[in-house]
Amino acid sequence: MTKFTLIAAFALTAVAAPVFADADIAKGESDFKKCKACHSIIAADGSKVQAGGKTGPNLFGVIGRPIGSYPDFAYGTGLLALNAKGDVWDEAKLAAYIADPTAWVKTESGDASLSAKMTFKMTSGAEDMAAYLASVK
C-alpha cells in the first residue's frame, strides 16, 4: 500500500464516520425496493427478510463478508480482484460501491481497467442502504 493510498484511506474513514452516524436504517429498508429487482436478503435458515431477484448476490450478512465471495455467484473481474486482495465489505466500502460501483472498483483496486457488473448507481441514500444492510443479521 502506498503512502498516498494509506493517507487517503484514513481521510475517507474520518470523513465517512460522521456520515454513517446520521444514516437512516428505516430509509435504507424502504429504499431496498430499488434493489429488489436484482437482490434478495435471505437468512441462512432460508427465511426471507426481503424477497427479490437473483441477478445479484444475496445481501444477507454482506457486512463483514469478503468481497466477491457469495457462493455460486458469478462475480465480475473487478470484485474478484478485490477478493484476491482479501478485501472485506464494511459500511463505508459498501456505501461507496452502491453510489457508483465501477468508479469504486477502479479506485479500491487501483486498476483503471477493472469495472463492476452492477450498473445501478444510488446517487443518494447509499449510506442509508449500507446501514440497513449492516443491521440485517
Over which residues does each language-model region extend?
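Periplasmic/extracellular electron-transfer cofactor-ligation site
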Residues: 23-25, 29-87, 101-112, 136-137
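Generic low-polarity alpha-helical segments
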Residues: 16, 26, 126-129
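N-terminal signal peptide c-region/cleavage motif recognized by signal peptidases
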Residues: 11, 16-18, 23
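C-terminal capping alpha-helices of c-type cytochrome domains
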Residues: 87-137
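Bacterial N-terminal signal peptides that target proteins for export
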Residues: 1-8
